[in-house]
Amino acid sequence: MMISRPPPALGGDQFSILILLVLLTSTAPISAATIRVSPDCGKPQQLNRIVGGEDSMDAQWPWIVSILKNGSHHCAGSLLTNRWVVTAAHCFKSNMDKPSLFSVLLGAWKLGSPGPRSQKVGIAWVLPHPRYSWKEGTHADIALVRLEHSIQFSERILPICLPDSSVRLPPKTDCWIAGWGSIQDGVPLPHPQTLQKLKVPIIDSELCKSLYWRGAGQEAITEGMLCAGYLEGERDACLGDSGGPLMCQVDDHWLLTGIISWGEGCAERNRPGVYTSLLAHRSWVQRIVQGVQLRGYLADSGDTGSS
């Protein structure tokens, strides 16, 4: 991946349950199977580019969606429920009131051949964060996308968790990004456009602020953002990755901790990726999206739990 970024200044009776368990644990292909109950968040049913990234495995990240504009991949997003996706607000810019231009492709691994088990759904409307301004482009860079109809969950289409208030991300925590963005500046992901993944460590917020320092009163890194990546560059998100997830694993659940937002160039030295923090914007999402699932680390027991 190198991830898509805007310019920095702009931017369930028992029989039924038994059948479900068989479907979820079978090693045989289940191409026509769907999960008809609300599944646990952040838990892929199957295990295993971005700049310096590598191919992901089919259904490894079943919450990642492609947001299409006029039928072509434009940005990525993350599935929260059967009707809601979250992404970066800058993916829509001045087209917030033109949802018919966009659609969402779910369950795809290779965009060049998404296959019959993928689902394509229109967008009913887009709701950006109230503090987002497309002219400025970086502050509160988060938007909720309402799908035209409910989707069917399957082993390839599952929701991700949001972090609860117990979650902390100390520097050097290893997390992951994934997307279908360019593999270098000006070099699109080649056919068949296989979803790329990349491990990225969390970067200390004060260090990131210093790297992007623009002078007093002009702080580029704010409390609603977090940084991750490599100071030496070479590996990063790039164009077409915007809106995709920064995912951290807590026990056996994957949490959406950030949204790919911006940076300067792709994989440039001392210019790590900047992400919209879901820790900072979780409450806003919860007020709007019914049924979103939270998980986190409970300090007294070390278990996951919802809140």
Swiss-Prot record:
The keyword Cytoplasm is assigned to this record: no
Keywords carried by this UniProt record: Disulfide bond, Glycoprotein, Hydrolase, Protease, Serine protease, Signal
UniProt keyword annotation of Hydrolase present: yes
Domain of life: Eukaryota
Active site: 90, 141, 242
Record field: transmembrane: none
Top-level enzyme category: hydrolase
Segments forming domain Peptidase S1: 50-290
One of the record's GO cellular component terms: extracellular space
A biological process term (GO) from this entry: proteolysis
Disulfide bridge positions per record: 75-91, 175-248, 208-227, 238-266
Coiled-coil regions listed in the entry: none
Annotated GO MF terms: peptidase activator activity; serine-type endopeptidase activity
Similarity remark: Belongs to the peptidase S1 family.
Protein name per Swiss-Prot or TrEMBL: Brain-specific serine protease 4
